[in-house]
Amino acid sequence: MSLGLVGRKVGMTRIFTAEGDSIPVTVLDVSDNRVTQIKTVETDGYTAVQVAFGSRRASRVTKPLAGHLAKAGVEAGEILKEFRIEADKAAELSNGAVIGPDLFEVGQKVDVQGVSIGKGYAGTIKRYNFGSGRASHGNSRSHNVPGSIGMAQDPGRVFPGKRMTGHMGDETVTVQNLEIARIDADRKLLLVKGAVPGAKGGKVFVTPAVKTRAVKGAK
């Protein structure tokens, strides 16, 4: 239950430490996160903060949503995202407030959620790293097939979740415990160490890490 930011994946680059070490980073644009609603236990049954990100033409906004945003005094956004937070943290915010990258600090571990790049219809070798069949020696048509999926008479069916060919990618993926390497407060950018899910321009959600790793050897 932590407040986070909605961002846009700009791309990857690298930065250098004072010692000259190269660090690969993903640049996330987290500008203009604005509060559209504060939900409370009394009115909604739970405590949360609703945030708008990006922009959207007025002609693309439904009348109910337009009224909702007008009540908060906030322009329409491309995305509405809700973050569950504690009641005391919600009390510090108000409709129309802008949440910036100063929500995080350099060195902090975060979880980044996005939608992975779609790969289309893929076979089991590409999708699940299956091994291929023999190139010859009696194999004429089954080089890349996954093999039998059948079961015995009992249970007499294929279990759900069987790894087979199908649509690869385009799934919600969360990468945990990424480190914030640098923050550009002027341009409202987060530079996160490592790669995050999705293509350039994709939307991501950045929240404080839930399962922070313990330092090896620490007491």
Curated annotation (Swiss-Prot):
<keyword id="KW-0689">Ribosomal protein</keyword>
<comment type="function">
    <text>One of the primary rRNA binding proteins, it binds directly near the 3'-end of the 23S rRNA, where it nucleates assembly of the 50S subunit.</text>
</comment>
<dbReference type="InterPro" id="IPR009000">
    <property type="entry name" value="Transl_B-barrel_sf"/>
</dbReference>
<dbReference type="GO" id="GO:0003735">
    <property type="term" value="F:structural constituent of ribosome"/>
</dbReference>
<keyword id="KW-0687">Ribonucleoprotein</keyword>
<dbReference type="GO" id="GO:0019843">
    <property type="term" value="F:rRNA binding"/>
</dbReference>
<keyword id="KW-0694">RNA-binding</keyword>
<feature type="region of interest" description="Disordered">
    <location>
        <begin position="133"/>
        <end position="153"/>
    </location>
</feature>
<dbReference type="GO" id="GO:0006412">
    <property type="term" value="P:translation"/>
</dbReference>
<protein>
    <recommendedName>
        <fullName>Large ribosomal subunit protein uL3</fullName>
    </recommendedName>
</protein>
<feature type="modified residue" description="N5-methylglutamine">
    <location>
        <position position="153"/>
    </location>
</feature>
<dbReference type="InterPro" id="IPR000597">
    <property type="entry name" value="Ribosomal_uL3"/>
</dbReference>
<comment type="similarity">
    <text>Belongs to the universal ribosomal protein uL3 family.</text>
</comment>
<dbReference type="InterPro" id="IPR019926">
    <property type="entry name" value="Ribosomal_uL3_CS"/>
</dbReference>
<keyword id="KW-0699">rRNA-binding</keyword>
<dbReference type="InterPro" id="IPR019927">
    <property type="entry name" value="Ribosomal_uL3_bac/org-type"/>
</dbReference>
<dbReference type="GO" id="GO:0022625">
    <property type="term" value="C:cytosolic large ribosomal subunit"/>
</dbReference>
<dbReference type="Pfam" id="PF00297">
    <property type="entry name" value="Ribosomal_L3"/>
</dbReference>
<comment type="subunit">
    <text>Part of the 50S ribosomal subunit. Forms a cluster with proteins L14 and L19.</text>
</comment>
<keyword id="KW-0488">Methylation</keyword>
